[in-house]
């Protein structure tokens, strides 16, 4: 469930790559990453779910500490912040921008999960 060991290994590999690139490219280039959670995209909301999509979305939203599913546009300001001087002290960091899913993961609710 959740993608299994290959998915998990790929996430850890990306985190390691961010840290290694941050080390190698400092001080001229800062490298940080963003780990989003569920995003409202065609890939995140497969058509195979058909008419079940609204109930699945409602169930996911109920399971999140910040109960909404963001769109890709919701991350723009975070990326701009990371590219700005406001983040000049940050490098090698992965920001969890996942509506709190990393706190406990998705838990089963009565809303469709």
Where are these regions (language model features)?
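A glycine/serine/threonine-rich, flexible loop-to-helix segment
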Residues: 38-63, 106-113
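A conserved structural motif in NAD(P)-dependent oxidoreductases
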Residues: 64-75
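Short C-terminal tail/terminal secondary-structure segment
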Residues: 80, 91-113
């Amino acid at each position: 469930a959740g993608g299994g060991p290959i998915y998990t290994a790929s996430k850890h590999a990306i985190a390691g790559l961010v840290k290694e690139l941050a080390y190698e490219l400092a001080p001229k280039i800062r490298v940080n990453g963003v780990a989003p959670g569920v995003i409202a995209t065609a890939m995140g909301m497969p058509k195979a779910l058909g008419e079940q999509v609204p109930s699945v979305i409602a169930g996911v939203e109920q399971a999140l500490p910040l109960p909404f599913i963001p769109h890709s546009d919701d991350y723009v300001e975070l990326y701009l912040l990371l590219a700005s001087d406001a983040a000049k002290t940050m490098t090698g960091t992965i920001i969890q921008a996942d509506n709190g899913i990393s706190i406990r993961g998705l838990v089963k609710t009565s809303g469709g999960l």
